[in-house]
Amino acid sequence: MYTYAGYPAVLCVLGLFRRRAVRLDESYCPRVILIISVHNEERIIRDKIENSLALDYPKDRFRIVVASDGSVDATNDIVREYESRGVILKAFQRREGKSATLNRAVLGLDADVLVFSDANAFYREDAIRKLVRNMPDEEIGCVVGKLVYVSNHSYVGRGESLYWRYESLLNGLESRLKSVLVGTGTIFAVRRALFSPLIKDVANDFQLPAEVASRGYGVVYESGAVAYERSTFFFREEFSRKRRIIVRGLTGFKALRTNFGGGFRMFQFISRKLIRWWVGPLLPVLYAVNLMLLSNPLCLTFFVLQNVFYALAIAGAIMRRGGVQSKMLLVPFYFVMVNAASFAAIVTYVMGRRLASWEKAETTRDAHEHAGFAPQLRVIEGKKDLSYTGKHKGMENLEHIT
């Protein structure tokens, strides 16, 4: 329970005594380059570029770079159509993975701030302004934006939306201490001067915040900088994605452990990530221990509760396959799925497999195709229904709950 409830409680207490305010300046407009990582994104790259061009930021202070990692579809041709509007294509023939692609793309770029994004993430119109308003504070080296999932009403989609609301809560609590642990790969900004070459098997949104913090700069969360992304639909896609993230996280920790040292950042990593990742492998162990100690009333109670919880998760899986969904079964189903993925990830890591190339979830692209990201979708942010009325390109009909 510590990793889910105890750690947030510790952050709340620390925030009362160690809170460090950020000096904001709404008029601050540094030179910004938005880097979009892509691999075979012909279905949505046009909408992404249109969304990026429509962002509210001075055009003479803003450039868009599309870093294409071995794309063999029409992605590069579509991007070239926008070169007359200032979009820069950096196309690399050989696929080497996201980190290698970003390293090559950043070479020679002259800017004050780099913003990293993916093709399937659509920014709210003021997202860049909200990110950089934190940068006049010279203590700040990295700013993490808010990812909001557009739910497809599947168990997996709703579960992921719930998970990211929890992650956003942690980001907000850590931000009070100017020490957000990890970035959000679809929307985060780093000072150009603080960018360092990315390690092949390590996620950029894990490595860059860690290295920025190790150099004495703060990492903060900006809830006003919003990116919308469609959640996955299929179990196998989300399972594979979670497994990949955890493997890369473990790889990153091994490669960057000196950056964490033995101080607060190490405490954060253990509390927020490492313990959580090990919950999956420990659940079967806990089940077996309780089974062997049924004569103990406390162990018997836990054993019964475990069986009830797993039964609810199985019921949720069965009902999902039958097209029936229950909110009551969502949490057990998603919890078991995520921890099964963490178990698989640790096995993968121990066996020595590393995942340098990113494999996109196809259903996160399906809703964009021929629709300009304007199907009747919902973003789960709270309980109240509001009609989305923003002017952001490709998002006109988006409905969300806030």
Residue ranges and their predicted role:
Residues 13, 18, 25-26, 276-354:
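Membrane-embedded multi-pass helical conduit in multi-pass membrane proteins
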Residues 99-101, 105-107, 117, 125-202, ...:
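Long helical/loop segments within the catalytic core of UDP-sugar-dependent glycosyltransferases
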Residues 135-166, 200, 204-270, 340, ...:
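Catalytic donor/gating beta->alpha subdomain of glycosyltransferases that bind UDP-sugars
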